[in-house]
Amino acid sequence: MKFVDSADLIIKAGKGGDGAVSFLHALFVPNGGPNGGDGGDGGSVYFQGDEGKHSLLDLKLQKKYSAQDGFKGDIKNMHGAKGEDKIIKVPVGTILYDKKTNNILADINENNKLVLIAKGGKGGKGNARFANSRNKAPTIFEAGELGQEFEIRAELKVLADVGFVGLPNAGKSTLLRAISNSKPVVADYPFTTITPQLGVARTKNNDTFIVADLPGLIQGASLGKGLGHQFLKHIERCLVICHIIDASGNFGSEDIIKNYELIRNELKTYNLNLEKRAEIIVLNKMDLDEAQLNLLDEKIINYFKNKKVIQISGLKKENIDQLLFMIYEELKVAKKQSLWELDKNNNQDEMVIYKFEEQKEDIQAYNKGNNRWEIAGETIFKIYQKFPIWTEDNLLMFNEKLKETGVYETLVKKGIKKGDFVKVFDYELEWTD
């Protein structure tokens, strides 16, 4: 089983800035030429791999990301500035899907890898670009193109950094709730957790790591008893093991030591290379009087004196910050060791990368009845968006571009007549011969 963290996002690149319509106005130059500048390109949206991130929690908190629009062109041939790009940092191993097609847009498989997901719209041309020998004072301009927009799903196959192990009812699920955003089922009976529960823990310094509350272990798990191999398979991916022990055991120090050794032996039997893994012994339920008395026993003090031990109460959230700090420090060391390189290459799924291509849409012409027609399609929309009919020259250009698509010829073949009206998105134009 792999843990999968996911987040749904709306990604929007910036719109290009509109081109400007202006003319030179200077002393002794009464009929200056056009000098409207071009608009700037819209900002694009990129995703970047960041090995310092371990979850998609940030993406879940902010579901919409937009790059900045390009700035409009101005007088004196001044070009608008480009919109600022948006860079979204995600953990290495994040895969991005187009929600509509379920195609893979990108596999962020390297640290600092930068991937373009939504391209900003091109800035529109100002009227200075349209001057020619036939039209020396054009009022034609282009609106900036719209930036790309996608609904995407980000998925991260999570390898838990830290595994909570312990006998059933040791308080692992309660502790997971205390240190993370996870909400596992908690009840006062054995085997509450039957599948791994995942949580993102965050220290006071905003360092994060992934914690897995693993199913309660019983004697004989290495031989397949109980949840057996299923449990042990999960823990071999963890870099740090937190051994959670109920310090309030009915039989005092003997109970605590026996429980620790039982699980330790099961892990050894499964050949988990424990000597290479950091271990923290977490004595839980210290809010209970029985636990306080048990830890006064010299046997306990001597047995654990050379081990990393911390006393906490998951229920009362006592000493939790110190536990998180201890875990994170151990994790930093563990990630530098060769074990991390060995583990992260195990059981890697083969990945097929699909090239994302925009769907080409045919031009459509509809007879709506009552002398009303409508034209639509991606190509028609681009012309509509690019040439706002705010000036007479733009209206002429708009018609010329539509004519080039062949849609007018299609309308004639379908029987359009002089005086009919043609709807082009929110424009309605009268047809003339």
Swiss-Prot record:
Binding site for GTP: 166-173, 191-195, 213-216, 284-287, 313-315
Domain OCT, chain residue ranges per copy: 355-433
Residue ranges of domain Obg in the record: 1-159
InterPro entries: G_OBG (IPR031167), GTP-bd (IPR006073), GTP-bd_Obg/CgtA (IPR014100), GTP-bd_prot_GTP1/OBG_C_sf (IPR036346), GTP1-OBG_CS (IPR006074), GTP1_OBG_dom (IPR006169), GTP1_OBG_dom_sf (IPR036726), OBG_GTPase (IPR045086)
Binding-site residues, Mg(2+): 173, 193
Residues of the OBG-type G domain: 160-332
Protein family membership: Belongs to the TRAFAC class OBG-HflX-like GTPase superfamily. OBG GTPase family.
Name the record gives this protein: GTPase Obg
Originating species: Mycoplasma mycoides subsp. mycoides SC (strain CCUG 32753 / NCTC 10114 / PG1)
